Amino acid sequence: SSAASDVYKRQLFQYPTEKSITRMAKACIKRLQALEDDSLVSAIASQPTDVAKQICLYALMKQSRLVWEFMLTVIGEKYRLRDTSFGKIDLNTFFMRLQEQNDTVASWSDTTITKLKQIIARVLVETEYLDNLKADHLNPVWLHPVLENAIRSNGDMAILPAFNCFS
């Protein structure tokens, strides 16, 4: 698809190979198509990289309840409390709480949980919530109006705190 090749040309995702970039772009576009939001699909190709990354994060959150919950209950709550500290303990606490609340999550192997923690941490770095995997603080994020409008029109206002948006 042209959006996928555009994502590749602009190096939207910092991955070394064209194949992995194209795969990620296609996954993102597939998630967006599931949202049935043409404005966001076209914004991915036309907006600056940081906006496109935010849109991809939102699409991932819509597709993955786990990511939605993490972004809302951990990241959103930290922004709400103006607590910029962040570390492995935040990921560990989140997964421990989930394991206590949910039998399915409780049945997951340690390997699976570790992999999910790595994925979430990488997503936070790619979307510039964190400077790198060793970062000990959250960066302030600014929700782009294109995405904010889409979130509101999709009735997803509950997720706005994950984007440091409280208005």
Give the positions of each predicted feature:
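Basic amphipathic alpha-helical segments that dock to polyanions
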Residues: 22, 26-35, 118-127
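Long amphipathic alpha-helical segments with strong coiled-coil/leucine-zipper propensity
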Residues: 29-61
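Short acidic alpha-helical/loop segments enriched in Asp/Glu that coordinate divalent cations
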Residues: 41-44, 81-88, 103-108
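Positively charged, polyanion-binding regions of nucleic-acid-associated proteins
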Residues: 55-58, 62-84
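DNA-recognition alpha helix
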Residues: 87-101
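Accessory, usually C-terminal, subdomains that scaffold auxiliary metal cofactors
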Residues: 106-167
